[in-house]
Amino acid sequence: GGRKAKSIGINPSYRYAMGIVITANHLGMVLVNLKYEIVKSERIRLKFVSDMSYCSQVADFAAKFLDHMNDAEQKEKLLGVGISIPGIINQEQKLVIKSHALKLENYSLSFLEQAFSVPVYFSNDANAAMMAEDMNTYQNAIYLSLNQTLGGAFCIGGKLFSGENQKAGEFGHMILVPQGRKCYCGKSGCADAYCAAGALVGESKDSVEQFMQLLQNNDEKAEKKWEEYLDYLAILIS
């Protein structure tokens, strides 16, 4: 006897969250549902500049990205916006303490926050990438970010660990090669100078994408550079 069993589940499209990735030359946008499934994504070329015009452009692109929702739906269905930025970020003060990639120091993010009518959360790019992983599965993990600069993040006990000064995952300035290549920070031999994506192209005007194409075409110089890069990366990880 008794009532028949009913299957109850979450409606994944009941609410959404938006993610924005800011880099020196691009803007990435993604919309996810309650199951963390990507509903929509877009990447456009947009050069970062540290004035209000950039904030307005980001707001305009975000509005177009969400044009399938009207204002009322956005307020009702959009839980918030997470924005990832390369650099050391103070979320409480909404401040970029320092970003070499964007050439910023003590830069207020309040104008960018005001461009949206929903809660906005800021995070370092590597920390954001770590949070995008399943931290319940990977209770203790290290994330290594190989972009324009080298960074990383720690997951300890299923929680992101940023450290007192938000610098816990800044692996880029560990000395990898004593008296080695000059780093932008002023020191010599930093891991960033050897393992950031820019190390693959060196002083050439090629992009990383162009380098990878050369590698696919079995270019001898590119193959040699790639092997050298992997050697340094292996030393860093070990």
Labelled PLM ranges:
Residues 4-40, 143-156:
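Gly/Thr-rich phosphate-binding beta-strand-loop-beta motif of the actin/hexokinase/Hsp70
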Residues 32, 89-90, 154, 176:
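Hydrophobic alpha-helical segments, especially N-terminal targeting/anchoring helices
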Residues 38, 95-96, 160-161:
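Hydrophobic "anchor" residues
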Residues 41-43, 50-51, 110, 117-217:
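Glycine/GP-enriched mid-protein hinge/lid loop-to-helix segment characteristic of carbohydrate kinases
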Residues 42-140:
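Glycine-rich phosphate-binding loop and adjoining helix at the ATP-binding site
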Residues 53-71, 191-194, 199-238:
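Adenine-nucleotide phosphate-binding core of ATP-dependent small-molecule kinases
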